[in-house]
Amino acid sequence: MVSSVGAASEVQLYLETGRVKVKNQGKVRFLSHSDPLNPLIVELELGEQVLTGKNTRARIEMREKEEEIRLRVDTLFKVNSLDLDQTEVEMPTGKARFKIKRKLNRKKKQRRKFNVRTVTALVGVRGTEFVMGTS
C-alpha cells in the first residue's frame, strides 16, 4: 500500500547487532551487523516485513523519530501505512517496545492515530510508551 505521505525515507531500520530478514513481494534481503555503537541504517518501504533473529537488537523509526519501535528477538513486523492522520503497523508474532510522540495535526486539529494489528486484535494506541507481545 502506498500512501500520500509514505515514502521510503520515512521508515528506517536501525540494526544494532544480530540478523534480520527483510521481505517484500517475494524479494528477500538478509542483513547482519555487530557494532551497536554504529548501527546499520536501512531504508524500508511500506509493506516490507522485518523478521528479527536470535540475539538481535533492532529498532524502526518513522516520521523523523516521532514513532520508534524496538523489536525483540523472533519478531515479525510490518509498516502497513503512513497517512497524514494515522499510522498502521502489523506484528503477527514477537514482542516490541513502542514509543510514540503524538503531535497535533494542525489542519484537522486532532492527534494522529497509531494502530497496531496483531493476529487476534487491532489496537488503537492512546498512550505514548508501551510494550506489546503476541505469539
Where in this protein do the model-derived segments appear?
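Flexible, surface-exposed loop/linker segments and immediately adjacent secondary-structure boundaries
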Residues: 2-135
